[in-house]
């Protein structure tokens, strides 16, 4: 099992603070905020599949925004009353990594939710690398129907 120090060394200080201590990266600074390439986003800690570029949108909030996870079972929601606010925290199911928060002000045509996720909690897997990286089963997400 990976120690805290080993994890911090593998993913970096910011990703460690975000995923393990529920820190928040500064708005408009994350690698994936204004990034719209085709592929999937996985938990930087565990590699578990979380979000698809098909569900990513520009919310203008300063963090990557998604209308939904690839499958609802991939994330867990938790009440968060930190900083005097009432929010819903989003964590990855397997690793329990803090990802961000979910709000009910997303695009109505896509279900009305906005998953506001820290770039530091994510790793992007480009579509053309998904098979090589072990995510071939998710390629069908991008099949045209």
From Swiss-Prot:
Among Gene3D superfamilies, the record links this protein to: Peptide methionine sulfoxide reductase
> What does the record give as EC number?
1.8.4.12
Source organism superkingdom: Bacteria
Q: What are the record keywords, sorted? A: Oxidoreductase
Name of the protein in question: Peptide methionine sulfoxide reductase MsrB
InterPro entries associated with the record: Met_Sox_Rdtase_MsrB (IPR028427), Met_Sox_Rdtase_MsrB_dom (IPR002579), Mss4-like_sf (IPR011057)
An example GO BP is:
response to oxidative stress
The answer on whether this UniProt entry bears the keyword Oxidoreductase reads yes
Q: Where is the MsrB domain?
A: 4-127
Gene source species: Streptococcus pyogenes serotype M1
Extract one GO molecular function annotation from the record: peptide-methionine (R)-S-oxide reductase activity
Check the record and name the PANTHER family matching this protein: METHIONINE SULFOXIDE REDUCTASE (PTHR10173), PEPTIDE METHIONINE SULFOXIDE REDUCTASE MSRA_MSRB (PTHR10173:SF59)
Q: Which protein family is it in?
A: Belongs to the MsrB Met sulfoxide reductase family.
Q: Which residues form the active site?
A: 116 (nucleophile)
Q: Which GO terms describe its cellular component?
A: cytoplasm
């Amino acid at each position: 099992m990976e120690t805290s120090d080993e994890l911090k060394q593998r993913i970096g200080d910011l990703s460690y603070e975000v995923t393990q201590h529920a820190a928040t990266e500064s708005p408009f600074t994350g690698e994936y905020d204004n990034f719209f390439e085709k592929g999937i986003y996985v938990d930087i800690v565990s590699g578990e599949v979380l979000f698809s570029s098909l569900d990513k949108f520009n919310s203008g909030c300063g963090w990557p925004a998604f209308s939904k996870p690839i499958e609802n079972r991939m994330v867990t929601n938790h009440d968060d009353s930190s900083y005097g606010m009432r929010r819903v925290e989003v964590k990855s199911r397997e690793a329990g990594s803090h990802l961000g928060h979910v709000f009910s002000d997303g695009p109505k045509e896509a279900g009305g939710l906005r998953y506001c996720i820290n770039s530091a909690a994510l790793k992007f897997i480009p579509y053309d690398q998904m098979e090589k990286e072990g995510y071939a089963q998710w390629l069908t997400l991008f099949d045209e129907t």
